[in-house]
Regions:
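Intrinsically disordered, low-complexity regions enriched in Ser/Pro/Gly/Gln/His and often acidic
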Residues: 7, 11, 64-67
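N-terminal acidic leader/helix
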Residues: 8-24, 31
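A short, exposed loop/beta-hairpin motif centered on an aromatic-Gly-Thr core
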Residues: 43-56
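Intrinsically disordered, low-complexity and often Lys/Arg-enriched segments
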Residues: 1-10, 19, 77-80
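Short aromatic-glycine-(Arg/Gly/Cys) micro-motifs in beta-strand/loop hairpins
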Residues: 23, 27-46, 78
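A short, charged, amphipathic alpha-helix used as a generic interaction element across diverse proteins
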Residues: 53-70
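Short, mixed-charge low-complexity intrinsically disordered segments
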Residues: 23, 67-80
């Protein structure tokens, strides 16, 4: 996954995998201070929208994750 433009990643909300494909939901902060929520594959940005740290936005990201998991996507194990 790549950083687009002058944005810096703040947090990864989730990582999913299915048949060798990966998706990540990442919050970025741009040079202007605004936050962006991106769902990214290894090759492309699938969703890119403004993000405000509000329960509604976090619930939307969680609902997308749950919908993908119902369709066969699995959590990527985290290593520390």
């Amino acid at each position: 996954m790549s950083v687009v433009g002058d944005s810096a990643p703040l947090a990864t909300l989730w990582n999913l995998t299915w048949n060798g494909d990966r998706l990540a939901c990442v919050v970025y902060r741009g040079a202007d201070g605004r936050m962006q929520l991106r769902v990214e594959s290894d090759d492309a940005v699938v969703i890119d929208e403004r993000f405000e740290l509000q329960p509604r936005m976090l619930a939307r990201a969680q609902a997308l994750r749950e919908a993908l998991k119902r369709r066969g996507w699995e959590d990527v194990p985290t290593t520390i």
